[in-house]
Amino acid sequence: MPLVRFKIRNELSLGGPEIQRSASVEDEEPKAILGAVEVAGLIGILRQLGDLAEFSAEVFNGLQEEVTVTASRCQKLTSRVRRIESALSPLEKAVLSQTSHIHFAYTAGSEWHPRIRNGHSHFVQSDLPLCVMESYEQCRDPPPLHLLDRFAVGGPGSCLRKYSDPTFFRKELSNPSKTDDIKVQRDQAHRKRKKKRLPQRNICRSNAVSTSDETNGAHLSSFTDDRPTTSRSTSTVDMPRSSNMQDLSDIVDQSYLQGQSGAQEQSEAQVQSDFQESSKARDSITGSGYIEYVINQSPVDKPEVKLVEGFLSGSLCPADRIGSTVPEGCIEVVDDNILYSPSEDLLVPSASNVCDEKKETLESMVEKSRKDDEPSELHESKFGPVTPDRVRQNQRDFDRTYILFDEVDIVGEKQSKSQANNIDGTLGIENEGEDKSEQESEADEFVDARNTIESESESDIDGVPKPKLEHYFGDISTYCSEDANSDNNDGSEDITYEEMAHDPRHENSEDESCSGSYLPEDSNVSSCLSDPVCEETLFHDENSQKPWEFFTMCPSLLAEKAVPDVTILREEPVMAHPLFAGDSANEKISSEERIISCPSLKDAIPAEKILPEEHLVNYPSLEAIPHEKILPGESIAKYPSFAEIIPQEKILSEKSLEEAVLDNMTPAGEPDAAHPSFPKAVQDKKISPEVLDSKIFSVPKAVSQEPISLEEFVRIHPCLAEAVPDERFLIEEPPSTCLSLTKAMPTEILLPEKTLESSHYLEELPEEDILQEKSVDSTHPSCAKAAAETNLSPEVLDSTKLSVAEAVPQEQVSLEEFVGINPCLVEAVPDERLLPEEPDTTYLSLTKAVAIEKVLSEELLETYPSLAELPEEEFLQEETDDATHTSEAVSDEEISQEVSDSTNLSLEEALPLEHISHEEFVGIDQCLVEVAPEERFLPEEPVITCLSLTMEGVLSEKSPETYPSLSELPEEKILDEEADDAMHPCLSEAVSDEQSSPNVLGSTNSPVAEAVPQAQISVEEFVGIDPCLVEAVPDMRDLPEEHITSCIYLTNVVPIEEVLPEEPFEACASLGKLPKDKISQEESDEATHTLSCAKAESDEHVSLEVLNSTNLSAAEAIPNEQVTLDEFVGIDPCLGEVVLDEEVLPEQLDTTCRSLTKAAPIMTIFPEEPPEVYPSLEELPEEKIAQEEEVDDATHPYFSEAVCDEKIPPLEDPGSTHPSLEESVPYEEASHEELVGTNPFLESAFPNEIGFPDEPGVTYRSSAEAVSKEKNLPEESLPTYPSWAEVVPDEKISREELDSTYPSSAEAVFDENISGSEAPGSTTETGRQNKTFPEKTFATENSLNEAVFDEKIPGSEASTSTTETGPHNKTFPEEPFAMENFLNEAVFDEKIPGSEAPVSTTETGLHNETFTEEPVATDISLNEAVFGEIIPGSEAPGSATETGLHNKTFPEKPFATDLSLKEAVFDEKIPGSEASSSTTETSPHNKTFPRETITTDLSSTEAVFDEKITGSGVPSFTTETGSHNKCFPEEPVPKENILPKEPAAAYLALAEGIPDQKVFLDDAALLLFAEAIFDQKFSPEVPDSTYPSLKEPEMHVAAPCVVTDLPAKNIKVKEGEVHNEPYTASDVSMNQKSGLLEPESTERTFPSSGGTVTISPDTQNSLPNGTSVESISIWSNGGLLGLAPLKPPVFAEPNSGSQHIKHEINEASVLSTRKQESSSRSVENAEKSSLPLIVSDPTSQQQSNMSSLSPMQSTGTSFRVFGLSHRLLMAGFRGNSSSTCKFESVPSSSYDTRVAAIEDRTQQSPGGSSFEEQLDYESSLFGSPTSSPPVEHMKISFNPIEASPVPKLKLRIPCQPRYNGENADMFPSFQLVPEASNSDDGDDNSDTFCQSSPCVSDYCLSDSELWESDESPRISVSSLKQVEERSRHGDMGSFSGSFLDLPCYDAVDHQSTFSRLEQEQVPEYKPSVSEIIRAWPPNQPKSSPCNEANVDANTVSKKTQDQSLGLVATDDEGGDSVCLDEHKTKGI
């Protein structure tokens, strides 16, 4: 039976089946019903056509693709066939030219094809089969090794070559060990003995050849050990494989062409004879069927002999294969090649052979050459065409095969060398430029295994049974020969492949190297060449693989010859050594740089074993041997190893060596000089070598260990360079990297081979020497020891540390640079190794620290100082703190380069001693350590982090010395007064350096601030950088910029700290609070939290003392208590947090500490600074900031605040720092990635591992980035984060605190200036909470953050937040996220009065209690607050509360929340109260609806948008939302469940305000949402009424509840109605989405329902003027065609709600209010917040509304909005309407109107219209008017709302809201909105879709035309009807979509489009339309809920029903009907 591929749905089902079934149809006029049915049928048909068109498009597209593919394949096949045809002719000739083809039976064609030149780039051709190409297309790109080129000495491409060069493996594999050489020698001797016996044996065998051939012929294939192919096939197989054949392919081809026929005959005869002879030979000779075959017997000049022998051995050897297969000429050539190859094969073994054999080999070669000449002569004579002779000759040759085999070893080598030299010389010359590298690579690629086999076969020649031997030779000898060639070529690659090619050939060299007969006279050259070939190959290969073999071999070679040293380096010299040699020993660099280099190595020869090992082990050999041997030797060894490494790296070494080594190398010629010379020359000049060695010991050894320099380079690069040695750098380097920094040792450990060697060498020597001497200090302390040895005072040490710390920071700066550079390296190199990168980065830092220490200690120290200094200077420029410290560090370095260098180096190494080093180290490394030694940092985390800082004893000292030097000084100093200022401010100071003396800063703070900041900064920087590196490294140091932006370390540190600093105050306060609780509960409350804030305010400096002492106690006490932990946690928080998560406070800190994480150290450093900064920020903020929201803005921006802080006193400087933090925070906030990035670096990059950091990270991210990003995380992060905020606020709120605290917060907020006592109250509460909940830190952190952002807000606010937080923390440890969100909110709300943040917090707290996730919402509200910074504090609280509730309701809302945040951003200007209202509303809502969150989020968004609107509006909104949430907890849940996308809708609403509209509702939902938004925008009154009412209640806490309840009831009714209606879920979802909007919706129900009727009850109530709103018909025929109307009609949009406007607005509000109410309040709020233009007025209105709600205003606003909606619709129905609509309506709407409207709206279709409005609003947010989507994207949705009697459908092009500020050209839903066709004129019928289609409205003028003419659309009966309909359906026109004015349907849109006059006329039709609508909805039962709302609720209900139907239809019909319904509802 046929399969149905596509089925078209019934047009009736596609139309509006409910129209036919609707019970309301009975109530409709028959004409209307018929019109509706007609339209429905038409729509169904259109939809069918659309479906068919879509299907056909798919079919044709598929056909086109197939045709294209087929054609492409045909072309490829054709091209392939052509190429094949062109290639076949020579093959055919070759095959046909042979007289006998029997060998084909034994030889695969692929085996003899090798004689044919191989093509290249076979897989690059475009005509390959798809099956082949697919495998390549699926391949990944090669690693971006080229990124490392700049760090490599070799220049561009060197790294890629280095790590992709197959010769490395070939050499490595081909390099036999000394034992192999010995074997080879024995084998040669054995063969010599055999050769003497062979002639006789061969003679004897010759007689039996034919018999044995026949007998054994069958065994030919098996005699080669498991090879099924005959020896011929083997030989042929080998031939193709030999690169020589490829190289010689030209010659071979020529010779082949020349002697093809003769050779074929001969070869045929020979093949037979060979076959027989070989069989006989094998059997008779070995008895086991194997023969020692002759690779090539005759010299190059005797091809005949070769052919004979080749054939004889041909069955046995590849040469013979070729010979047998190929004609004479070819055979000769091939034989020559083979001879060459065998000689090479022998060559390789010879190369393996020690120089001892060279003489023997030379002698034997001479003898063999003589012998070869003889046999070749014999063969030549026998080679004649006579087959019998040839057979006999072959027999004899075969007999002589063994002799020849030996001879071949000698002569063959010689010949092959000469031939190879000639051939290679020729080929090399020919292909030198091109093929050389390629052939080498290819040869290497193909020869690698062969090389190994060759070596084995060579070594096994006598040891292995000859069948196996022959197998190898037959198969391998050629390859070996090839490999020998390749090796020689490759070996000489170092020599240079060119040399082989150019040297006619190192025939001697090859002979020598191959034969192992390095002529004494040639020893220098040949040895160098041969050794390099062998050794270098070995050396190069053995570097890693066979260190000892190579080593033993190399030693013997080296021992045998000094030249081998040269040889050894030859390879290096090629890359590194020239530099090496160049610097070190210009001795023989010349052409034989290798040799010269080798001499350098020769100088290093003592280390030559080491060198090989080093090559092998790189550093370990260096380390082992260097330790074993002289340091110079070692350095030399290492130096060679570098050279080797360099050869390996070839880039790095040269570069590194040049840079690092050059200095060293200049004296490098002298082992000691080379080694010490660099450090000594560099350092010893300053410091005695002993000191240098002792102090810098690791440095001199380390540094002077030029390998270190290389290591540096290699380590720096080794991480890279060595890391470049991918094998190791990943494994070793990463740990090394991290550990290197952590400990030079770890790096060394991690890079045991290389880094470890280098570093370890450094380390080892230092460890052994220094480390053992001072193992603790000496590890890094080796540096430390150097430092200690330097005996710099701790101050100096500190300063040195600073130098060190700075050096580390510098390193990190260098790191940054380096990381910048190195990260590239690291990143470039170890992108693979992300963590390694980080470690690498870290390592680089370390590497730089270490390597730099080493390098820097010698040269780089200066260099590094240069780096450090420059970076310091630069960094100093970047980081004043660091700059200071850096300067100091620089100065320290400057203090004494010796000291600085030695010390700094020492210090850097001493840094480990410095604990700062550890801190830096750990700080730097911490992230690293933490990252790298997660094990450590987790266990030691506090220890390592802080301990790292304090690790050296700092922790034990409680970081007294290091940390205390950091911490202790902070404790002692900082803890006292300065300590806090110095310590925490030490960052502040460090940042500003103003408050604490640079000395203190430098010494104390510097260690602390710098050490910590830098350390931490290093860490953050490092982590930031490193995270940037680690995280950012992959990120390419995105964050470093961020870090840099923040002051990098400050950024990360500060940002967290900022969050934490304040939070530290909060957190620290809470932390400190615990201490401070201990210190003083009251002070804890006031001084502690307030201390941080209020006291910081009042006691700013005093309380800083106290705060410092206390806060230090807190920060430090806690940090020290847990400060160490906290700090630790702070420092370690990432660590400590994880580690200290155990600890409540640390967890708090963790939470806080998360911020503290970086902030903790910073906190420790910064806690003071925050006290300073925070106090400065806080104090100033309270003084200034609270007073100056601007500062808050600045604060919020933190850039600004930093700027403002700049305005702020020196504390400001910390403030600046703090602002940097804050700035970072704003980054964090503003940049989610920055939050995520900054914190994430720490968190994610650094402590993602840490649960809490993740949590903060997630939360933090989720707050900022995660929220938007983690729309997944939002729940997680948001929930967590929310839980933070949620818990905290919840506790506040839920503890009556919400009301009391919230008001308190609000009061506090509003009472920003409230005295500290109030703050203490808050603080006390906070203290209590803190007491109650150590975790509260999270909340505190939020509070802190909030405080931070709200710093300007009085401390009490922060306290409130804290208090709130406390409970929250109590409830939810993770709440800090929420709090953090809240913080962010506060941050953004910083400008908002302090109370706002608390309110938000309180609300959040409440919510958080209920919903942990809420924090996301909070975060959003935070963000919202952030964006809504301008909004009064209450607003933020409102937002927070709302968000809290919302979050509570919807964890996932975070997206929405995030959106709301963004919205809030847009709505920053909105008064705080508004946010508060939103918040309040949200709380209930959240309680009620977890999912409501979206709505809440929307409401937050709305609140955000509404924030701009007067605060009262928002509160009303919020309250309403709360009520709504309360009313429909399940709905939100079902809605959310039902509408994850509905949240999307909400999200869209948010997104609308925010670009983040990632969730798209179905067309219906989207349209409804957009329409709701649009309507809402158009009828701001509703938001205003609702908003003011809510806001007013918000201001009056009870009121929101009342309002909330009322809206809730309305919503219930509305939703009930709507919900009951078919589209209930969607509607509810819409409502839920609307959430807060629903109350609006309730008001708007009228718009959504029956515009006038609904408006009549509600609006009439709401609109005292009783002005009726005319429906606006919007024509967008052009829109349908994708044309944008040229000009929107101009509507007056009074910003202030004048009475007239108010009346108008009231009228419009009736519609728009209903719509808006129908649309989510969030939309409304969003609109408000999105009404920045009108915001001032709306805000005033809001405020006035708050104080007094005037329906007039709301009406006026609605009317204005309505006008705006008309404008917007006219303007483009998307951008314009959105932008126009979003403001005005909300501000003006009064609460009363709003309430009534809300009821109606809610009853009607709050969800739909709110959704629509939101979408509309979204559009308006983004706003530029945009034309309707192109026709191809247009979807004509028709969902008759309640079977409206209107026969006309208006094509409604919903405004495409610009998602994310972009016009998302999704498939806009075009809805044919049925409009009641009550009109009598026939235009309705004539105006059917057809008329509209031509883009002509029933007015005959397109909208654009009308707009151009500035005419308002003509009113037509249909338009009036539409207006009525619109009144009934809701103000469709307000929908921000373009409506295609299909005259039949014009009523709906035309109402929107109509001028106000028409709007006024609307009421005439409205009642009838309403009635029609009432009758219309078939889902009357669902409108029963609407009936619940019956007042005019019936109308509303019907409207709602319509919407519901639409919604339901949307659900049923894919959202199309919903859109219509929505549009109707909204339009109505």
UniProtKB/Swiss-Prot annotation:
Disordered: annotated segments: 171-244, 258-283, 366-390, 416-443, 877-903, 1469-1491, 1511-1536, 1639-1663, 1710-1754, 1911-1931, 1977-2028
Comp. bias (Polar residues): 203-219, 258-276, 1513-1524, 1644-1663, 1710-1723, 1737-1754, 1981-2004
Protein's GO biological process: actin cytoskeleton organization
Skewed-composition ranges (Basic and acidic residues): 171-188, 366-382, 1922-1931
Compositional bias segments (type: Low complexity): 1473-1483
One cellular component (GO) term of this entry: cytoskeleton
Bias (Basic residues): 189-199
Tissue: Expressed in expanding cotyledons, expanding leaves and expanding siliques containing developing embryos. Detected in unopened flower buds. Reduced expression in mature leaves.
InterPro entries attached to this UniProt entry: SCAR/WAVE_fam (IPR028288)
Subunit structure: Interacts with ABI1 and ABI2.
Record remark on domains: Contains the N-terminal Scar homology domain (SHD), but unlike the genuine SCAR proteins, lacks the C-terminal VCA (verprolin homology/cofilin homology/acidic) domain.
Family statement: Belongs to the SCAR/WAVE family.
Name this polypeptide is given: Scar-like domain-containing protein WAVE 5
Species of provenance: Arabidopsis thaliana (Mouse-ear cress)
Gene: WAVE5
